[in-house]
Design a protein with these regions (language model features):
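Juxtamembrane/start-of-transmembrane alpha-helix segments at the extracytoplasmic/lumenal side
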Residues: 312-326
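Lipid-exposed faces of alpha-helical membrane segments in multi-pass integral membrane proteins
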Residues: 324-333, 462, 466, 470
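Juxtamembrane interface at the cytosolic side of transmembrane helices
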Residues: 328-371
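Alpha-helical transmembrane segments of integral membrane proteins
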Residues: 367-624
């Protein structure tokens, strides 16, 4: 089974799915598409550009492996990956059934002609009636070749988080124009609250295009096997419902076995999840496992082996342990910075930590904190409403910062928050200077000499490469990375390091402003621990409010009415912020306490974000 990911992700995001399939005994290739993760970007100007973004190449590679059954290859792709999988199916699978192919052989090789009614008949029977004995031997030899070719195409594909593929196209059978879809078993999985172009799960069940694929005039029923039929006269026939995937088995149901062998089955799943949980939710992954277990008739190999039930999933535990590793990496950098600060080269950078500026009774602080939370809420609303439109327009700028549009969503989110934060910090600085005579910028050592800033940058570089070394170790020994859900970092290609430097130009100012805001909020009458928690709460409050307005209301409406509507704010790419915003507050405070300056925390946070963007997202528009 080939597993692939969506836009601005890498194969790391779907490795949990791959692990669960592999635990059932499947050979699984988890593949990063062109321009994603460690895969090279294809030459966009090349007229031979692969519409599957490398997924077809991965499929061809699978066929070189001697230990797989080449007649039972499946594919599953999420979001953009589902489009890539659909493109690979179009490139690999025949639009002609075996009967169509043999009718064309009879027509083109043996000079036979057929009426429209006759091409609905069995080609073998027609050949037996019309061909001589010698011709029939030749016919059978050609048939064996065609049958082998069809058998070695993709057997099943799941379109995850999308509704692409398997649309009818016109072909010619024995001189007659008819409509056909790729000869391949097909499945779709679209969450009830799926955000984006595919729409919600429920809307797809009643969409005209989906009902046409399933050959039904009534809403498609989820988790039901449909057996579609070939037709020639323009009148689409009604498909046959074979049963619920939970109640019948391909190991014992003859009708399902026959339909799977003919590659005419369709099925759709609508789990109770959002777009980004298609590969992180239990229900969604359980459906993937169950589908391939049934369609490929395989679960841990030998029939005598006890199969592993699709409800037995362990990948989430591993992903939570990856989160522990991610946090440990961050705290490891903190520990190393403490050691480095004792070295005489860096000791001169140690500044006095200023006396706390705010207090619990500081009305200005609480008002500005509330304004920041409101700004976060409005920023979420803006970037989720505009999504893909938030890109750079000038060509040289797009080449200089060349990651795909989801990176721009993160950056513009940070820019807007930084702009709002700059206004709030400016107000706070002016207030404290006039009211208390305190220069906040000077006391937080934002204003310092260049040699100290250079040493902070050097220390941040040492910390970054130490973290990269930790990643290399866990990749080599355990094939893991620092990740949780959509949030993570991974190994990079050489050109990605240069990308990090380019992206740091625009990201560093946001963390300098953030560091000032966080550390100017230290309070005289509150211990540092509780104060950090307050700052983390302020940074996350607007995000949580947007989540409540968008998703909780959708969930409540669904629970009350059974109608699953589209969340008003499509987080999709913003889920990492639930970890990042409070984590960056924590790091900004800890690094400030160690150095007495906001610079080191800003450099380290910038390095983490650039590393995440340039390693774990994608650049498919420009060859690096």
């Amino acid at each position: 089974i080939l597993v692939t990911h969506g836009t601005s992700c890498s194969n790391s995001t779907v490795n949990g799915v791959a692990e669960e399939l592999a635990s059932r005994g499947f050979v699984v290739l988890s593949l990063s598409a062109y321009g994603s993760g460690s895969s090279e970007t294809q030459d966009v100007g090349d007229p031979r550009m692969d519409p599957s973004l490398g997924i077809y190449d991965g499929l061809q590679y699978l066929r070189t492996l001697q230990y797989i059954d080449k007649t039972r290859i499946g594919m599953v792709g999420h979001s953009q990956g589902s489009k890539n999988v659909a493109a690979a199916v179009d490139m690999d699978c025949s639009l002609y059934t075996l009967n169509d192919l043999m009718l064309n052989v009879l027509s083109e090789t043996f000079g036979q002609s057929f009426t429209l009614e006759e091409i609905s008949q069995d080609a073998d029977e027609l050949a037996a009636r019309r061909l001589s004995a010698d011709q029939l031997v030749h016919y059978q030899a050609i048939r064996a070749e065609k049958e082998a070719e069809l058998a070695n195409t993709v057997y099943a594909a799941m379109i995850l988080g999308g509704n692409w593929g398997f649309e009818e196209k016109e072909v010619s059978v024995a001189g007659h124009t008819v409509k056909r879809t790729p000869v391949c078993n097909a499945a779709w999985q679209i969450g009830l609250f799926n955000e984006g172009r595919a729409g919600t799960g429920q809307s797809n069940l009643v969409s005209e295009s989906m009902m046409e694929r399933f050959q039904t005039t009534s809403p498609v029923l989820p988790e039901i096997w449909y057996n579609t039929k070939t037709y020639n006269d323009g009148q689409r026939p009604a498909s046959e419902q074979l049963g619920d995937i939970r109640n019948i088995s391909s190991g014992s149901d003859a009708a399902l076995q026959s339909a799977l062998a003919q590659r005419t089955t369709h099925i759709i799943f609508t789990p109770n999840n959002t777009h980004a949980r298609d590969y992180f939710g239990r229900d969604a992954v359980q459906h993937i496992v169950k589908y391939f277990e049934q369609v490929l008739c395989y679960n841990r190999g030998d029939p005598a082996t006890v199969p592993l039930d699709s409800s037995r999933l362990e990948f989430l535990m591993g992903k939570h342990l990856n989160l522990v590793a991610l946090l440990s990496m961050c705290f490891g950098m903190l520990a190393l910075s403490g050691i480095l600060m004792r070295h005489k080269f860096f000791a001169g950078c140690k500044k006095e930590v200023c006396e706390p500026i705010a207090s619990k009774k500081s009305v200005v602080f609480w008002v500005l904190g509330a304004c920041y939370a409101a700004a976060t809420y409005l920023t979420v609303a803006f970037v989720t409403k505009n999504g893909p439109a938030l890109g750079f327009k000038t060509e040289w700028v797009k080449k200089f910062w060349s990651m795909d549009f989801t990176a721009n969503i993160h950056i513009i989110f940070m820019w807007i928050l930084a702009a709002c934060g700059l206004v709030l910090v400016s107000i706070y600085c002016v207030y404290n200077y006039k009211k208390h005579g305190r220069n906040v910028l000077k006391e937080l050592n934002f204003l310092t000499n260049f040699s100290h800033i250079a040493k902070y940058f050097l220390m941040a570089a040492i910390l970054f490469f130490s973290a990269y070394g930790m990643l290399t170790v866990i990749r080599f020994f355990f094939h893991q990375d620092f990740r949780f859900w959509d949030n993570g970092v991974k190994d990079m290609l050489p050109q990605n390091f240069l990308q990090c430097l380019r992206y740091s130009i625009m990201i560093l100012p946001t963390f300098l402003v953030g560091g000032l805001f966080v550390n100017a909020g230290r309070m005289k009458d509150m211990k540092d621990g509780p104060n950090v928690l307050v700052q983390m709460a302020i940074s996350s409050a607007g995000l949580l409010a947007a989540y409540a307005v968008s998703y909780l209301t959708a969930y409540i409406t669904y629970a009350q009415t059974g109608a699953a509507g589209l969340p008003c704010f499509a987080f999709v790419s913003l889920w990492p912020m639930f970890i990042n915003l409070p984590l960056f507050v924590l790091l900004a405070r800890f690094f400030y306490k160690q150095t007495g300056s906001v610079w080191l925390g800003a450099f380290v946070n910038t390095a983490i974000v650039c590393w995440s963007i340039c390693s774990a997202q994608s650049s498919t528009g420009y060859y690096l």
